[in-house]
Amino acid sequence: MFISEIQLKNYRNYEKLELSFEDKVNVIIGENAQGKTNLMEAIYVLAMAKSHRTSNDRELIRWDEEFGQIKGKLQKRNSSLSLELNISKKGKKAKLNQLEQQKLSQYIGVMNVVMFAPEDLNLVKGSPQVRRRFLDMELGQIAPIYLYELSQYQKVLTQRNHLLKKMQGNSKNEETMLDVFTLQLIEHGAKILQKRFEFLHLLQEWAAPIHRGISRGLEELEIVYKPSVDVSESMDLSKIKEVYYESFQSVKQREIFRGTTLIGPHRDDLQFFVNSKNVQVFGSQGQQRTTALSLKLAEIELIYSEVKEYPILLLDDVLSELDDYRQSHLLNTIQGKVQTFVTTTSVDGIEHETLKDAKTIHVTNGTVDCEIDRA
């Protein structure tokens, strides 16, 4: 699949923009704070209905405006689709072929993207929240039911935490309601956990050989899910629910005392092992970056295996963060098969066949000054 054009209105520092793209490689060049990352973000938001940079949708709307809009045309193997996302203070509304979608979960996954930005290099050594977000965003693209379960879980979690804070003063009158929320949380949480196990099993199958190739056969990558309760991938759904129920009973008084939910998918984490050593603790910066690169390349192949089309790859100022060897490995892997967007302050120092026929877009202060095709 590839995006052939995009239109922005009141998005970040863009008042109005219409732009067409090549189906292979597009290089967006500009100094820092001129709008190249905003353009890249707009493509991501059009696909995912949320930003990878902020959870505050108001930041996506141009200063002093009431709404922002992103439109795009997506070309898939057997269809051409128009996508539209309208952002206001009241929330987001999505349209597919001019038809408004009742739920964003019906819209997300139509256009698949993989974002690789400098902050993704922190996937290994960053906080558990970074890794959970990675799971949620990537899994949500290929399993719409996961997004539904996740949104329901988060709603119940908010209600349950509010009740737990209320119960810190007097717990006796609210225990029945707490039990109701707990059962709802278990219902959605168990399904989330099961989907994460399935996804990571597939990701492992793709990431391990990719990592082996980048490390020239010297390193073996293993991805390990670290749940907040004693469950395993081999358990069926009913067993996972049973373990959750027992675990919630055991931490009930502690949760009331602390006023928050202490277990569940929102407390889980991922660990990465290279040659049986925890990369987060014992890995070199090179090993951590190889692991992050392996995961991103695995995402591309995993999405292709599930939807039978390659996703759109967004490389936001990340090539300069990779050494020549990893840079070449990345570009060799995607060459000719993945529509790719690259942002950079300069193409100097990036010598690769992939970029020779790229469309070059120069961005200055929220305007596209010129577009040329590199010879």
Curated annotation (Swiss-Prot):
InterPro entries in UniProt: DNA-binding_RecF, DNA-binding_RecF_CS, P-loop_NTPase, RecF/RecN/SMC_N, RecF_2
Listed PANTHER family: DNA REPLICATION AND REPAIR PROTEIN RECF (PTHR32182:SF0)
Binding site for ATP: 30-37
Pfam families: SMC_N (PF02463)
Domain of life: Bacteria
Organism name: Bacillus cereus (strain G9842)
Record has ATP-binding as a keyword: yes
Localization per Swiss-Prot or TrEMBL: Cytoplasm
GN (gene name): recF
PROSITE patterns: RECF_1, RECF_2
Alphabetically ordered keywords of this record: ATP-binding, Cytoplasm, DNA damage, DNA repair, DNA replication, DNA-binding, Nucleotide-binding, SOS response
Coiled-coil positions: none
A Gene Ontology molecular function term of the record: ATP binding
Lineage: Bacteria, Bacillati, Bacillota, Bacilli, Bacillales
GO BP, sorted A to Z: DNA replication; DNA synthesis involved in DNA repair; double-strand break repair; SOS response
Protein name, per record: DNA replication and repair protein RecF
Keyword set includes ATP-binding: yes
Alphabetized CDD domains for the sequence: ABC_RecF
A GO CC term attached to the entry: cytoplasm
Family of the protein in this entry: Belongs to the RecF family.
